[in-house]
């Protein structure tokens, strides 16, 4: 009876794998044999906003990122960050113990939608750049998919010794690309 739904299960597994692969590429892809991720496209350019204190996330940094975005792009701007960064912002309190960003409970930050992107930096590492928070008009980030995909069934997988392992495999091939159209439509925080 296990064979009845094998194609449905195989489809589910392959679609999930493609989604995970695409999410990473659309965020940090290099643009060489893969899509250009929005973090990669913005890193090192004028869209980067440095944190007030190196290797630290402070409430003032959030305001600085939002203020740095030109008015032209503010109307459709949204936030995106790793869940660790979102949770760090949720924990920020005033000296009286009130939350600095209580609207994060409703998926908003400073009046704009907040989106989770697990492929962004979530831990601040002192030895590298940390692009932990992005804000901008994502209508200026384009994703292009070529219609169709190819699934190749591999009847015998080979081990390191070049002999069959008794396992079967599948290779899913599809084409996709992405890039930022207008760098000025985004700001990204480097903590």
Segments the model singles out, each with a brief description of its role:
Residues 1-191:
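Structured, hydrophobic secondary-structure cores that serve as assembly/anchoring elements
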């Amino acid at each position: 009876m296990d064979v009845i739904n094998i194609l449905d299960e195989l489809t589910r597994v392959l679609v999930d794998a493609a989604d995970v692969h695409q999410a990473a590429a659309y965020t940090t892809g290099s643009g060489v044999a893969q899509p250009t991720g929005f973090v990669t496209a913005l890193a090192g350019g004028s869209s980067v906003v440095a944190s007030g204190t190196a290797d630290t996330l402070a409430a003032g940094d959030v305001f600085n990122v939002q203020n740095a975005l030109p008015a032209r792009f503010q109307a459709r701007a949204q936030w995106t960050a790793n869940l660790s960064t979102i949770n760090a912002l949720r924990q920020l309190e005033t000296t009286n113990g009130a939350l600095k960003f209580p609207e994060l409970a409703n998926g908003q930050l400073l009046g704009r939608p907040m989106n989770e992107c697990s492929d962004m930096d979530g831990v601040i590492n002192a030895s590298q750049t940390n692009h932990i928070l992005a804000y901008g008009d994502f209508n200026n980030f384009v994703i292009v998919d070529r219609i169709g995909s190819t699934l190749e069934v591999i009847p015998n997988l080979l081990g390191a010794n070049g002999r069959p392992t008794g396992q079967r495999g599948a290779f899913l091939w599809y084409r996709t690309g992405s890039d930022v159209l207008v760098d000025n439509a985004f700001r990204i925080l480097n903590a």
